[in-house]
Curated annotation (Swiss-Prot):
HAMAP family: NADHX_epimerase (MF_01966). Catalyzes the epimerization of the S- and R-forms of NAD(P)HX, a damaged form of NAD(P)H that is a result of enzymatic or heat-dependent hydration. This is a prerequisite for the S-specific NAD(P)H-hydrate dehydratase to allow the repair of both epimers of NAD(P)HX. Pfam families: YjeF_N. (6S)-NADPHX binds at residues 58-62, 127-133, 156. Its cofactor is K(+). Residues 10-215 form the YjeF N-terminal domain. It catalyses: (6R)-NADHX = (6S)-NADHX; (6R)-NADPHX = (6S)-NADPHX. It comes from the Eukaryota. NCBIfam families: yjeF_nterm. It comes from Drosophila persimilis. This is NAD(P)H-hydrate epimerase. The lineage of its organism: Eukaryota, Metazoa, Ecdysozoa, Arthropoda, Hexapoda.
Amino acid sequence: MVKYLSQSEAIELDLDLFEMFHVGQLMELAGLSCADAVAECFPAQTHPRVLVVCGPGNNGGDGLVCARHLSLMGYQPTVYYPKPTLMSLYENLTNQCHHMEIPSVKKCPSLSDAEEDYDLILDALFGFGFKPPVREDFVPLVKMMQETKVPIASVDIPSGWDVEKGKQSECDFEPKLLISLTAPKLCAEHFKGEHHYLGGRFVPPALQRKYQLNLPDYGSKLVVRL
């Protein structure tokens, strides 16, 4: 059985990966994996309009990469990136979205706008470094995701969930799709949605042994269903 990681294990594993790979390389593979998982569950023919919600950390970077790949797969992504990270890696990812002519919005969509304008929300707001409560700046966005009927695909962690314990009283939305990256986190044991995929086909054998990950065989795929 695949190992589900604690928050401290996930952080330590990430640090080990950063010693072996450039963070941009890992982000590219993670974001592409997310796009593949979306395509498996929500085809562009039925869910073309995707709101990609990006947070200020690595999870948001994964979202920017995913938006770019979704645009190449026939989707019509729109990026909402309320707190951009002022580092060259993230600025480059943002510029790449601009070059792909991916539109962005400056304000958090209202509940009615989200349900009228989008067929899917990609939640790349908070990652496994998150600790409750949700920052005040992001409360309206999380509230919209809690109340919307638009299906949500969450990247690694449903935003606002405790990384180990799962749903919190102030954030209890259930995504339709959870895309765990590298290895699932403990909160994924509480996931009750329809689709759970694992992406991140880049963990060297030594790290798989060190953390006893027992990862599935990806074969030629970028993601596997759990």
